[in-house]
Amino acid sequence: MPSLLRIVGLLLALLLILVATRRLRRRGSGSRVPAATILLIGLGLATVSVAPDLVRPIQDVLGLSGEPLGRLVTVLVISVALAYGALFYALGRADRANQRVSRLVRALSAAQVELVRTGGPLGGVLVCVPAFEEADNLPGVIAEIPSTVAGLPTHILVIDDGSADATSAVAAGLGAHVVRHPVNSGQGAALQTGYLVAERLGADIVVTLDADGQHDPAEIERLVGPIVRDEADFVVGSRRMGASDSDSRARDAGISVYTRLINLLGGTEISDVANGYRAIRASRLSEISFTEDQFHNPELLLGAARAGLRVLDVPVTIRRRASGESKKGTNLRYGVGFLRVMLKTWLR
């Protein structure tokens, strides 16, 4: 005669199956992954309740044979594994949906450049400045960008990442090309828009420069020079080789750890992997896969190494923000996000 535990298990299984079936029959209720997971757990619980010996092989593997509640614990372990599998599947679907939306935002924003494009390829150096509510800092940054670098003309592109202030108007008034995201999408998304614009305009070299005044535009030639001389395809500015006004020991320690990890995974010899002051040969951008709207540094660095770009770092200076507060969030959030993208890119 079935035990009370098996009877309770069967009743619970039937309840789960009923709930899952009703949810799966609803139309327009969003993702079906949660309901499908409940259904699988219910079917599994029903199977075990009717034929408990079916889980014995897994119970043996887990070392739970002979334990008083071994079979129940085994069922719980299987259920948790199914739930985690469904969770990762749902997260993957959400990530892919987010990437599709992000690509649409970037494409629509980059299309704005056609309104300002005249004649043939732009050539020269396109200085991409991602900006989110930096109307107060942009005038000083743009004023310091030289008109020529290493014998090449410079062009300024400000990517307004959905600012609520006058960032776009200020940038346009200072003579910069401006494209604007309709919503705040993240610095990585803004830079990807900049890369897309650079390819459409036919720029030779792309320089990325923060809008908060931390990067010294007078040092752009240090980044561009090695590419012009065909010594590198991708040049990274390094505060380790240069100077920094940072007063955060925790952040500095984290950068050191992640620099070692990136070099280990990518086979590079970079001394600063968290600096956004960089230059890259525009013709090589299409060889790197970009998917991250945030914490884009590891994706770019590992992608460049995987694509076989010649990577070089040069000394630069990191200054304090001219005004306002950093948009990068806390050190912990930044560190966790950086690690997540680094591992995700390496495993891709």
Describe each PLM feature range.
Residues 134-137, 163, 216:
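Donor nucleotide-sugar binding loop of glycosyltransferases
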Residues 129, 153-162:
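Short beta-strand/loop segment that forms part of the nucleotide-sugar
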Residues 160-168, 213:
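A conserved acidic beta->alpha catalytic loop
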Residues 30-36, 47-60, 64-83, 90, ...:
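Hydrophobic helical membrane-anchoring modules
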